[in-house]
Amino acid sequence: MSTVVAQALHVFGLRPHVTNNVFFFDEQIIIFPSGNHCVKYNIDQKWQKFIAGSDKSQGMLALAISPNRRYLAISETVQEKPAVTIYELSSIPCRKRKVLNNFDFQVQKFTSMAFSPDSKYLLTQTSPPDSNLVYWLWEKQKVMAIIKADSQNNPIYQVSISSQDNSQVCITGSGVFKLLRFAEGTLKQINFQRGESSNYLAHAWVSEDRVIVGTDTGKLFLFESGDQRWETSIMVKESTSSRSLEVIQESESLIEFPPLSSPVSSVERMDITTNTQQQAMPQVFAIAAYSKGFACSAGPGRVLLFEKVEEKDFYRESREIRIPTDQQSNDPSQSDKQDVLCLCFSPSEETLIASTNKNQLYSITMSLTEISKGEAAHFEYLLYPLHSASITGLDTCIRKPLIATCSLDRSVRIWNYESNTLELYKEYQEEAYTVSLHPSGHYIVVGFADKLRLMNLLIDDIRPFKEYSVRGCKECSFSNGGHLFAAVNGNVIHIFTTTSLENINILKGHTGKIRSLVWNLDDSKLVSAGTDGAVYEWNLSTGKRETECVLKSCSYNSVTTSPDAKVIFAVGSDQTLKEISDSLILREIPAFDVIYTSITISHSGRMIFVGTSVGTIRAMKYPLSLQKEYNEYQAHAGPVMKMLLTFDDQFLLTVGEDGCLFTWKVFDKDGRGIKREREVGFAEEVLVTKTDMEEKAQIMLELKTRVEELKMENEYQLRLKDMNYTEKIKELTDKFIQEMESLKTKNQVLKTEKEKQDISHRERLEELVDKQTRELQDLECCNNQKLLLEYEKYQELQLKSQRMQEEYEKQLRDNDETKSQALEELTEFYEAKLQEKTGLLEEAQEDVRQQLREFEETKKQIEEDEDREIQDIKTKYERKLRDEKESNLRLKGETGIMRKKFSSLQKEIEERTNDIELLKSEQMKLQGIIRSLEKDIQGLKREIQERDETIQDKEKRIYDLKKKNQELEKFKFVLDYKIKELKKQIEPRENEIKVMKEQIQEMEAELERFHKQNTQLELNITELLQKLRATDQEMRKEQQKERDLEALVRRFKTDLHNCVAYIQEPGLLKEKIRGLFEKYVQRADMVEIAGLNSDLQQEYARQREHLERNLATLKKKVIKEGELHRTDYVRIMQENVSLIKEINELRRELKLTRSQIYDLESALKVSKKTRSQEVPESVISKDVVGSTSTMRLNEQEETGRIIEMQRLEIRRLRDQIQEQEQVPGFHTIAGVRLPSIVDSDVDFEVHTK
């Protein structure tokens, strides 16, 4: 066994074509089939547990759960044999309880099943032509009863047992409705159909003997004990959205044109429409009963709830539930047109689950249906939108935990394997064949039937930004670095770059369709494999094959490489896994009777996983073993289409033809996860376009304004309500006060009455007590008397029993005496018999002795007779012996002769055997050659068949396109007429629109001008405000200075006034004046004024030096740039001169070739004149000239193309030079001048003429 273990972790998908495919295990857990498993899914906690199907199972057909929810029955086909497996759901993990697979009757498969109410019995229905209904006691694997359900082999859709009675059984089918009762080991029909039979699709028990039955014409019947009690017809109702869409479509066009992508012809389309009109009746595919009534499907996307009318035997429609339209669908009006195939209520009847024919699960809370009165309620997705067809593409990325899948249901989906959710999905008009996810997780490449599209993964959308005309691309893959991606077109590989989005390489070499691509780790090589049996390794730098391994007998399905890219692993149709290295097959590991469909290897190179055609996966350890050393796991219900490992080797991802996606956790044998440390966590960034952000910002603004408005409205409403409620409260308080007063009076009255009643009750109680005491005394007296009587009777009975005991003892003694007498008599009787038998025995012994004596005498006589006979025989054989000896001598001579002949013949035989061995070896060689040739023939036949198919497809496509063209030409006239009318209607509106647009542009210009003016004015205002603040500060400083000066002047005046008093005394006056000078005039002021002037001069000189230095550096930069531009210009001029020289040389060659052509043409004219004279010579010369002329013409075309390319290059370079000349500071060199292209063009045209 392998040491690699995979454990199923989560599944995205619902298995189709299973009867009763969803159940509730409890309020939170549901059970549904997915792949080759049944899944227990917790709705609240979002976990899944798996119940694996049987080994080598070919598919589940039907499910059934017991009423006590302990057992689950699964009908499946195991190794082409039907079987019913019953699991015990209460055990963890769920274990098999019983397997019903030994049958005494013919059975192909079980199509429907049901448990009895007590879960002891199981009812199963087999498929036609047997159509047996079997009633099992399943725990003992015993068939209790079996009956043929329908003698006409009509299909049976559903069987069930009554919800309260084990013995009542109901079956419904095409023209079949039977009620049966199990009694005395048989099933007997208790109802008989009257009138026309219908196609009964579903039924449900609503009570012990009542059944609701639905038909394909939208009718519901209620049967009670086989008699019809009620009937109704479901009316077709369309949702408002679909009606509005139809009205719009009718108003847009009176004639319906077929879509361009539809290959169906108009006649076939009419047939389809008639069929759809016939099938417009709502078909009742599912019915589920609950306590209030029942729910039933009523046509596409519609479920009706019926409730029982009280005290009557019929039901009325109470609610309608619809499947919502899917806005991500390519046709939202048709997305809700799904048939509901199964309905299921939770145990508390709080939730209803529905499954549809498009493999979707929907749920609804029943309380919501009661809230939505008048309008139809809508289902919600129980999980998320799932794939409804085969998944064809799978990929994952490095930077995010994302999985990308695409399917034949025309959808692309992005899943998150970390949170097990659906991130994005979108449906398209074309089928998607392959998908590849960029390592960053921001882009995907999808191959559609019409084109290859490169798309962005936005936050809520998948939006294409580049399309390539690669039709029907079945394989594509991003490189590990993400800078390249490869796409397959039939047998050709295109390599595109993600930077310039151009096709940089085309790899050709395969002769068949390419099935698989894989890049090596450094993206330098690409490995491809296809149906032609070829595995190629391409070198992308050269575009050539480096290694190749071709085995035409094998059609490869998948390929992968080891991490070091030295070994290639390939799987295909020959049931082997091949190890290829250096173009040689190193080993072939057998697949043991299955075909490997896909393969992947871990990034560590130690684990290999392969998917098989029967839906299983195998985990192997590398290096591989030739023995069965692998672990095999049940996975899908069909071939595994794709599989891969995540970048950290933690999870295995697989997709299948059944439309399911599995995620597996990978472990080693000890249960440890294979750890690869992530250096960086998963990225959380998403792509959002600028327009989306602006729209969302606008929406947010609008919503904010709306919220403000609503707040205002709510406040106003609240104030109104407060006023109303205060008034009501006042009214109620007044009312309640009045009522309280009235109640108080009533209470007083009642108290008085109560007191009266208490008095009367006391009197009555006293009377009753007296009466009871009297009765008790009477009873005691009676009981005493009865006791005395009973005691007397007891004594009498005791005496009787003593007497009877004495009698019985006497009888026992008598019996013992009689017994001993009887024993003595018997012994005497048997002793007499014994004596008689001994006498008889002695007589018999004497007879035996007499017989022995007689035997001895007869023996002697026989011996004597035998001796005589022996003597006679002896003489006879002696005579014969003599004769034989004579003949023996004669034969010895003959044998000598024959021995010589034998030796010669033996030599011949040895020679012949040697010849035969040589021929056998030649035959083996020839057989090997024949086998290889047969394999080649088969491969060629397959190739021819595939090419024929492609040719037929293309011819069919051409035919369909021709038909479409004819139809479109028919409708062209009508469309032209409509276009003219619409143009007439549109012209005035367009003029108005133009006028309005001009007005809007003018207004926008004015608005921009006003905005600019406003900004300029705001700037001016800020500048002025700053200036104002500065002037205010200066003004305050000046005012302060002014105040200081005024104070100084006042002080000076006072001091001067004091000095005036000494005017008559000069000496004192002089001293006072000197004191004033010293007080008011200071030397520091003078020094400060001089210092300020010197500082200003220094600052000015410093700034000047700085500006001069900057100017010098800028001059140097300008000179350097000019020199650089000059060198570039000289180089370009030199290139142009060389190119013009080449052109002139090519023109000279062209002129020579033309002159040669002219000479040859003149020679031809001469040869035409002399044709009649020399016919054969002229023919030869004509052939020669024709061949030379064709050669010359081809050369002429080639030279013309070269000249055209050179001319375009020269023009491009001239434009480049002009752009360079327009750059400021760039000057042309006066010495260099190019020859004019115009003159050369004129010369060229003259020569050509």
Swiss-Prot record:
GO CC entries: cytoplasm; cytoskeleton; sperm flagellum
Repeat (WD) residue spans along the chain: 105-148, 195-233, 335-374, 386-425, 427-469, 471-506, 509-548, 635-674
Keywords from the named record: Cell projection, Coiled coil, Cytoplasm, Cytoskeleton, Repeat, WD repeat
UniProt-listed PROSITE patterns: WD_REPEATS_2, WD_REPEATS_REGION
Matches recorded under SMART domains: WD40
InterPro entries, sorted: Beta-prop_EML-like_2nd, CFA-57, Quinoprotein_ADH-like_sf, WD40/YVTN_repeat-like_dom_sf, WD40_repeat_dom_sf, WD40_rpt
Coiled-coil positions: 690-1056, 1094-1165
Pfam family, one: Beta-prop_EML_2
Domain of life of the organism encoding this protein: Eukaryota
Annotated tissue distribution: Predominanly expressed in testis, lung and skin. Weak expression in brain and kidney.
Subcellular location, record wording: Cytoplasm, Cytoskeleton, Cilium axoneme
Function: Associates with components of the nexin-dynein regulatory complex (N-DRC), a key regulator of ciliary/flagellar motility, and might act as an inner dynein arm (IDA) hub or linkage.
Family from the record: Belongs to the CFAP57 family.
Name listed for the protein in its UniProt record: Cilia- and flagella-associated protein 57
Species name: Mus musculus
